[in-house]
């Protein structure tokens, strides 16, 4: 929808609504504030409407955005202890995992990108790390689902073009198939890093290193930790699209923090510090987060309004995994949370959230949608989440069970390439004889 529609009228009608008031140090206050925002978010939930799909939101919301939204509601539970939406979150994550429990559901497979699948993978690894209520024994488990996403994406690692990297799109018929973008590779990197920490398995860490090194070598990650958007294989990734988005740097920053936590390496510590400093310098105006590419010009599209929410989430993960970043990141999260709450004073309900938090004057900008609600939810709960989040792993109480072979038996024919063989050999080197001797192609 147009981001300029209704702005003037809305400003006149709703500019005097009272903004959401929240004491960020009080759990009950944050619970109340985020319940208002979460209720607004669920106004866009398709599953509550006749004929709607479980786990999906109303058009024009994208499938990947639904996965990210459930992660936000999961984080609300972790921060506040309020379990109101837990069953909905759990049901949605399982239903959308698809017929083969790999986040390739038949309704979306032909239009799905690697970034789309990866965001669902990040949601289920979040569930595993939080010790979220485990599915029944006859259902796929959170860790298993994350492993399925990882394994399938390894089979798509494309060394024939640009000497590595994931393409944006999975199928060649989709626009963007010839583009290797940062969000796909950054999400894969973070997922690998988190799986390494949760399972204490170096195979995942090795793939995290591969993804990071390739991203750096190709120019997605610059020497000063600027993170650009991607590149086309048509010129062998020699020309970089230099757009900078909040969620791209967040993906790499949090992934680097997980790798630091897993390895205690000074190399990863330096990288985390670099990303954190670049984030603070690039994406904050007077200590309040904003999206420079589109926010000032009011040109953010429907999903771009959600990107800031992911950066706040990833800042929390970063400060958790690499506590030396907390003195820099926590004050930014606090000031952003206050400003985001102040921007939730619009619409007919008086608590609809806008985009331009940097106004910081308890005024709604007239913009609304799923992305606005998602971002505000993540921002408002972030300071409390930082204090509440306990990131489990298998060795310290993480109860989710996995399957290192998940997702491989169901990989489409197009995945049965040299990378599939590379993955098989990689696991076998660690003593996992995971694949059947003969891969039957239909």
Swiss-Prot record:
Indicate what this protein is called per its UniProt record. Answer: Putative mannan endo-1,6-alpha-mannosidase C970.02
Q: What SUPFAM superfamilies does the record point to?
A: Six-hairpin glycosidases
**Any signal peptide, and if so, which residues?**
1-19
One Pfam assignment: Glyco_hydro_76
Any one GO MF term held by the record is:
mannan endo-1,6-alpha-mannosidase activity
Q: Which reaction does it catalyse?
A: Random hydrolysis of (1->6)-alpha-D-mannosidic linkages in unbranched (1->6)-mannans
Keywords of the record, alphabetical order, are: Glycoprotein, Glycosidase, Hydrolase, Signal
Record-listed E.C. numbers: 3.2.1.101
User: GO annotations under biological process?
Assistant: carbohydrate catabolic process; fungal-type cell wall biogenesis
Intrachain disulfide bonds? none
Which residues does the record list as glycosylated?
Answer: 25, 82, 107, 131, 201, 236, 261, 264, 277, 361
Family, per entry: Belongs to the glycosyl hydrolase 76 family.
How would you classify this enzyme at the top EC level?
hydrolase
> What Gene Ontology cellular component terms go with this record?
external side of plasma membrane
